[in-house]
Amino acid sequence: MRPDLERNILLAKSIEKPWRGTYTLVGHTSAVVEAVTTLVDALGDRIISQFGLQCDFVKLRATARLAAYLHDWGKANDHFQMVVRHQSNPLQNPQLIRHEVASLLLGWQYREWLEDCPYSDFLTALAAAGGHHLKLGWNSRKQEPNDELGEIREGSGSDRLYLYMSPKYFEGMIKYGIKALDLPRQLPECVRKPPYCWQVAELKLRRSELLEAFLDWNHDPAFLGVIKALIVAGDAAGSAIPNTDLKIKDWIKKQAGTTLNEVELQQVVDERLAGQPIRPFQVALGNTSTRVSLARAGCGTGKTLGAYNWAKQYALGRKLFFCYPTTGTSTEGFIDYVHDQVDSVLLHSRSAVDLAHLAATGDEDDVETKLESFKAWGAKVSVCTVDTVLGLLQCNRRPMYCFPAIAQSAFVFDEVHCYDDRLFGGLLKFLEVVKAPVLLMSASFLPWQLEAIRKAVGEPVEVIEGAKELEILPRYKFYLSETPNWERVEQELSRTYELPNGDQSCGKVLWVCNQVGTAIAVYKEAKSRGLNALLYHSRYRYQDRVNHHRAVIKAFKKNEPVIAIATQVAEMSLDLSATLLVSQIADPAGLIQRLGRLNRRYIGRSLDAIFYPDPKVGFPYS
């Protein structure tokens, strides 16, 4: 027998004091529809051009609103209602099906009515509503993807799902649909005679019928993806913001309207130039004529500054995402360029540690986590790891929550040469789907990579070469030694260099080892010799690693002799310029990255790189 509900109210969330109308299914649905509508209106036609959609704005708006209306219909069942009323423990007795699956099945059963929603695409709205949570299509028992339309769980303690679709409980939702979405007032039989209960056999049958209907569906994947992302972001806003003193409309309009202007970008460029003239290569980046451009230049040639000059043309009236392959490089890119200069935010899985201002990631329904994710909505510049953006196409949580920012941004992807096959494949898919301004930067692009990029973009791509006069400068002298030469290290730390601009610089040594144990031993030897030594390796706890990372960067910026002993973490995330490199022999790619830290700020002549063998040949990083 179906349990009666107190005051005949369907809940969307568990109740906390003080009472808010958004705890009810009608109230929450109204909040999400309002959030999605405001978001679509704020983004306007740009969302269509950003993703190359074939629909018009009216269809996009109507479909997004219908999906928002449908997204939580499936909460009108006894399993869910008992959970939010704390009368059932989902860990002990999981719900028979996820509420998103129930939303799909109910929406399909009510299709005769819902298909009459003006200007909307019903099937796209239904699919987006059913996929708005990120666990759909996942077998929680086997911890693997589920090809079926959601799993029917074991251990629920029941073989049936009672539904609350009768007027006694669901009339408010029907009336809201008529009022807000202009759905027909004349209700067809499927609405007048709603389902009461689904047993497992009927659930499987209805699921199969829906899957069969979708098999013949000729849909636009980009359109579906955009609607789904809007629902995820709108649901997050509709869940979190009503629990604050903020008004959804006002907040979303303000965040979406915060975009870059030329004065701010010029400020970043001028700050970094520090009175020096801008290089022709950097000027050329600002004058590119294609939507997608490539900057091919080596370390220390000014690619990052050139990228902000590029943004002066392509990110005006937009937001800007600056994407790095690692948390270390994204953190340093944030601190060195835009922190305290432009409304900006650092986004990656460990940015809470880096900035000490983000809450720890919790459950996907945690209000605080969602509110913290919204910082990207209002930031003009987001500096992040590349997965923060590319993960959008895999429906990862953070980029889905950041979608309102991604939907109106220009993008810079740095250090593309460091991407593995998975990341590069994700980049190609992004270039194929997203039609935003994009700048790709790398020390090198292989011919097959250039061909793949051009094919994915499907339109002309301009390649801007770095300053040849800088790249051909003699930066290194190579020496091979059987053992480390401490006398040479001490000699380097006592040196003073005359810089091309007339300034002077003390000697600075970067010593890179292949194993943490070796690095610790070298560090102890350096300290025993009375040297100003710093240790930085990959086995520190992340919070400590961030502190050591910054200590090394800070020490190399001072005009004092210093030696930093590091492991392979130095290969990518250390933006410093050493006057002597000492390194164990490693793989070629690693050695090239290590050399990128030697003479990075050109001293006026070539400097020494000393390599010595690693006794653990074949296991350089173990």
Model-derived features: positions:
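Interdomain hinge/linker at the junction between the two RecA-like core domains of SF2 helicases
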Residues: 445-502
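Inter-Walker segment of RecA-like/P-loop motor cores
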Residues: 342-395
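Conserved segment of the helicase C-terminal RecA-like domain
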Residues: 109, 597-622
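Accessory nucleic-acid engagement/destabilization modules that flank
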Residues: 2-257
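Conserved strand-helix element at the start of the C-terminal RecA-like helicase core
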Residues: 319-330, 500-527, 534-535
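Conserved Walker A/P-loop ATP-binding site and its immediately adjacent core
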Residues: 313, 317-351, 445-450, 516
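Walker A/P-loop
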Residues: 288-311
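Post-DEXD/H (motif II) to motif III coupling segment of the RecA-like Helicase ATP-binding lobe
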Residues: 400-413, 417-468
